[in-house]
Structures are given as structure tokens and as C-alpha cells.
Amino acid sequence: PEHLNTPLWDQLEAQINLGMQGKNKGLPMGFKKLSNYISNIQPGRYDLIGGATGTGKTALVDSAYMYNPIKYITQEKETDFSIKILYYSIEITPLQKIAKMVCRKLFEDYSILVDSESLFSRGNRSLLDKDIAKKVFATRDYFEKMLSDHVIFYSAASPDYVWMTVKDYVEKNGTIVRNSNKMIQEYIPHKPNEIV
């Protein structure tokens, strides 16, 4: 029989060869058991997380798809991957999200447990301790670099807005190949190892 000689078969062989070179490990998400089932964060794969209200979906997604991968990339010298996160938040503002990220960093680096409302000394909470405030302010460079290199926050999130901003990002950061019916046939990113 004649061998299959198609672009699809070529892609199959290329993926097998990359895997044999250890280049299909993906980007670690910080949850080993989960990664055993879904093989880490992989380029070109869409993961959907669903569940009831208040069950920790946002906390899981933030940890697995933002905090842990960014931490891995910034600390690991041998990774081929980079990551860019287009973060659409309907529930909380970018300021609130950054405050939560700062609280997490305080806990990771100093074992200081503080929530974002306490960080802002809101309501009947005590004023934030000056030593903790100094530690918060010392994280500025870390977070500014993280945001400039890895995260773009969007506070509006209608379906049309999401489509428009993703389309703009894709067009600026890659080449879209269309067929004669103008359907997208292939996307060739300028940075093939960047997971978006």
C-alpha cells in the first residue's frame, strides 16, 4: 500500500519525534495528580473548568494556569516555553486580582497570611502592619515584570469583546492561513513555544 503522505501525517510524525526528544512535557501546573491525567498545560489545547458557585474554580484556574506556570518559567532555566495570559475577569477588578496575587506571594515568601480586604485595611479591619506593607511594596518589581511579560488583564468580558481582543492578539503575534472560503486553516505563531 501507498504510504500516507499528508500534512496531517507529517504533523503526527513531528509530534511523535518531539515527544521522543522530551519536548512534549508541557508547562507544569503545580498539581501532579491532575497533570498525570491532562499532561500539564499543552500548546493548542483548550481546557474548560466548570463547577457550582463557590467551589474554587477561580482559585484552581489562577493557581494551575497563572501563578504556578509563571513561577515555573521565571525560576526554570531549561524550559522552552513562555506564557502569555489574556485574563478576562467579570467578577473582580484587575486591582483586586493583583491584591490577591500579592497576598499569595506574602504567604509563599514569608508565611504571612493576609487577605486582600486586610491588605487595604478596609472596613473594621486593623490597619495593615508597616512591616507587612514594606514587604508588599518590595514586590512591585516582581509584579510589574510579571504583568509586562506574562499577563494582560481585561475587566470587560462580553463575548464580542473577548473575540475582538483575542483576534487582535492572534493577528499581531502570528500568521493566519485561510482557505479559499476564508476559513481559518492554520495559525502559525511568531513564538511557537509561547502558550497563550
Residue positions per predicted region:
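Short acidic catalytic loops
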Residues: 192-196
